[in-house]
A protein has these predicted regions:
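Structural signature of tandem alpha-helical TPR/SEL1-like repeats
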Residues: 53-66, 87-100, 110, 121-134, ...
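Terminal, low-structured helical/coil segments at or just beyond the last alpha-helical repeat
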Residues: 26-37, 215-261
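Structural marker of alpha-solenoid helical repeat scaffolds
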Residues: 70, 104, 138, 172, ...
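Canonical tetratricopeptide repeat
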Residues: 46, 80, 114, 121, ...
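Helix-start (N-cap) detector for alpha-helical repeat units in TPR-like alpha-solenoids
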Residues: 34, 41, 75-76, 109-110, ...
Length: 261
């Protein structure tokens, strides 16, 4: 596993995606004292909440839409409707609902966060970056949002900015393994190999069952000429994710550029 091929080309297979894509932040239970809501609209909103909780998403969307019809400035209903759309993987509709919620409730960092996640699901990275930046302006101490902004920057090949955001996420939440992993991957892309190794080793310590972290460490050790360590990490990848190990083998053998996920 020590074939001398492009480090950045190999790393691109996993860089700055962090395993599963981000999840949406579920809204806290709505308190009708927060805004003046017509009783009929509130009843439809509550109905939508119950339906969504039971995974009856289409019916929930209809109830939230009815609440909005009764009260067009109902920001919470737009937000919950966006969550219901997202729950059904209907992200274009979710974006529209979250944008309307953000227009009506511009100081809600949670709405901005969920809008950004919906953009990530649609691979609209510039929109995601701008939205997460606004979410951070509203709530600068949210580690998850800093992490998500790092992902968006990474996908835009803004590795320095990505590194900054992952480091901030770690400052706020030192146990966030995925932030350590992606910080390591950003360091790899920047050619900062010693820092990459330290970040990836910390990610493995926090989450030893993440195959992507072992993959990145395998690449690092192969590049450094440490055959024993590279093979150890390769065996870890193989045990956790045989398909990923096969991809790594093919890439190392061919020395060919990897396609971004």
């Amino acid at each position: 596993m020590t074939r001398n091929c492009s480090l950045k080309a190999i790393v691109l297979l996993v860089v700055l995606i962090g395993g599963a894509l981000p999840a949406l932040a579920q809204q806290d239970r709505y308190d009708e004292r927060d805004e003046t809501v017509a009783p009929e609209a509130l009843a439809q909103f509550r109905k939508g909440e119950r339906l969504a909780k039971n995974d009856r998403l289409d019916d929930a969307i209809a109830a939230f839409q009815q609440a909005i019809t009764l009260q067009p400035d109902y920001a919470q209903a737009y937000h919950q409707m966006g969550l219901a759309y997202a729950g059904g993987n209907r992200y274009p509709e979710a974006v529209k609902a979250f944008k309307e919620a953000a227009r009506l409730q511009p100081q809600s960092g949670q709405v901005q966060e969920n809008l950004g996640v919906a953009y990530i699901k649609l691979a609209q990275w510039r929109e995601a970056r701008d939205t997460f930046a606004e979410a951070i302006r509203l709530h600068p101490d949210n580690a998850e949002v800093h992490y998500n902004l790092g992902l968006a920057n990474g996908k835009l090949n803004r590795d320095q900015e990505a590194r900054t955001q992952f480091a901030e996420a770690i400052r706020l939440d030192p146990a966030m393994a995925k932030a350590h992993k992606n910080l390591g991957l950003a360091y790899l892309n920047l050619g900062m190999l010693d820092q990459a190794r330290k970040s990836l080793q910390e990610a493995v310590r926090l989450d030893p069952k993440d195959p992507q972290t072992h993959y990145a460490l395998c690449v690092y050790y192969a590049r450094a000429g440490d055959t024993q360590a590279a093979n150890r990490e390769f065996q870890a990848v193989k045990g956790l994710d045989p398909k990923l190990a096969a991809q790594l083998t093919d890439l190392m053998r061919a020395g060919a550029p990897a396609k971004k996920p």
